[in-house]
Amino acid sequence: MNIEATLKNYDLSKLNVVTIASHSSLQILRGAKRHGLGTVAVAKPGSGWFYRRFNFIDNVIEIDLGSMEQLAGDLVKNNAILIPHGSYVEYVGWRRALSMPIPTFGNRYIIEWEADQRKKMRLLEYAGIPIPRSFNDPTQVDRPVIVKLSGAKGGRGYFIAKDAGELAGKLSSINTDDYIIQEYVIGVPAYYHYFDSKVYDRVELFGMDLRYESNVDGRLFNLAEPTFVVTGNIPLVLRESLLPTVQKYGEDFSRAVAELVPPGMIGPYSLESIIKDDLSIVVFEFSGRIVAGTNVYMGVGSPYSVLYFNEPMDMGERIAHEIVNAVKRGKLINVLT
């Protein structure tokens, strides 16, 4: 869409932040309201009642999320800025996200890369970030591996195999070839939250978390195969000596996206990693938008946010801060696609 032409008809004093009512929407909309922006939640039929309980949400619209384009005209008339997150990627789909006729905060084109596991790894490799070994031929597997399906499904459908024989048996039971086989790296998981600011021209390391996954983090007692469906998140603070490496990876990723997926990273994104016992960091995934792990800091702010703003701020507030200050500096077009 022609963002510049659309913004000419916007009343920039009456912007409305719009997002799908799921994932990190409460954090996003609360942050928008705190910064004086209007707020709209687009909910699946039957789920809007929950979001109507919160007075920081001005309007809750229930609609089949696959038909969200039907709302675009009215939303644009009301100066809408769409904030994508994982549920938007999953339920609306990356193809619709690319063509959605609503100005979108962030780089909407990275969503296509995020939806494809092979393109994901290619982008990380291009950035020069250490990644796990991948196997194109299942018969060549010589170590424990994890099989990952494409799409933002919160880890649903992923599984582990200890060797090539076990892998062959498990692959025969799935009905898709849209997956990658990746070395299962042993270590501590850590998920890093970044914000690429066009207002301040910097990449901010804004926080980090651990995922709590069912049932690999539950009580298996050898009664079930481990699965990786995300059920929640846990705050994390890293030892300070690791922070320069994490910052460098975030900046390297931002540079790679600028080269391969113009106009580059805008706003929140995440690198997902394993920290090995030698303290080396291997990155196995990225998310090109806000991640649900940022919810652990909602209302209290990440401890790292004070390093930039001298006050705690959560990612929802950070997004709103960027929008408001982009308007003040005449840079709103620089944070939208």
UniProtKB/Swiss-Prot annotation:
Binding site for ATP: 144-191, 213
Pathway the protein acts in: Purine metabolism; IMP biosynthesis via de novo pathway; 5-formamido-1-(5-phospho-D-ribosyl)imidazole-4-carboxamide from 5-amino-1-(5-phospho-D-ribosyl)imidazole-4-carboxamide (formate route): step 1/1
Catalytic activity as recorded in UniProt: 5-amino-1-(5-phospho-beta-D-ribosyl)imidazole-4-carboxamide + formate + ATP = 5-formamido-1-(5-phospho-D-ribosyl)imidazole-4-carboxamide + ADP + phosphate
GO biological process entries: 'de novo' IMP biosynthetic process
Enzyme Commission code(s) on record: 6.3.4.23
Cofactor: Mg(2+); Mn(2+)
PANTHER family tied to this protein: 5-FORMAMINOIMIDAZOLE-4-CARBOXAMIDE-1-(BETA)-D-RIBOFURANOSYL 5'-MONOPHOSPHATE SYNTHETASE, 5-FORMAMINOIMIDAZOLE-4-CARBOXAMIDE-1-(BETA)-D-RIBOFURANOSYL 5'-MONOPHOSPHATE SYNTHETASE-RELATED
HAMAP family, per database record: IMP_biosynth_PurP
The protein's name in its UniProt record: 5-formaminoimidazole-4-carboxamide-1-(beta)-D-ribofuranosyl 5'-monophosphate synthetase
Organism field: Caldivirga maquilingensis (strain ATCC 700844 / DSM 13496 / JCM 10307 / IC-167)
Taxon lineage: Archaea, Thermoproteota, Thermoprotei, Thermoproteales, Thermoproteaceae
